[in-house]
Amino acid sequence: MKPSNFPMPTVDAVLAKYNLNNRYYDFSCGWGVRLLSALKNRVAYFGTDPNYELVARLKQIHQDYDLVNSTISSVDIRATGSEVFHPDWENTMGVAFSSPPYFDLEDYRIGAQSIRGRDYRGWLGEYLQPTIDNIKRYLVPGGHLIVNIKNYGDYALYDDTFSLCESSGLTYVETLILDNITRPSAKQDINTDEKIMVFRHGDTEKSSPLDLFVF
């Protein structure tokens, strides 16, 4: 398995369904697909990524987009990991949605990457847990945390992320299925579908884990 670009139609669908207050936090910015979806859908975009060179390029994408489209978009991207808390974002975000870095798979060598100097348990405790805790503080009541991640190899990334979200007091809502055949690196003869977990900050009627919606 190797990293691949995230399909923009999925981001569009998530924002259409879960955009609560027009403020979207992308906790692992990646190569800009989620940023472009936010720009296209006129949603204020807030992002973190430790790769400072990537952050500079994303800011340039924002400037170029506004120049070409004669728009004034709201974008705030910070060159930190998502485990770093930003007090001015507390209780402001309606939705947090991203595909976080996979342990031992995605290390882009620039900035304070989440895997550096950590084994898997350290990554869970020092990166993923504080990331979830921060997002819970960023979300307004009724806001949603939406995570696209999957188990791979010996690492139960999906299962452990799900457990950490529940133990943090977030309420499970539903599971979406990303038909990953739309990704550039997907192979036609291999099922690479991925689950997208949805949690809510605050009480809600729980869905069954079998209630799936396919993008």
Predicted regions and their residues:
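Class I S-adenosyl-L-methionine-dependent methyltransferase catalytic core
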Residues: 1-215
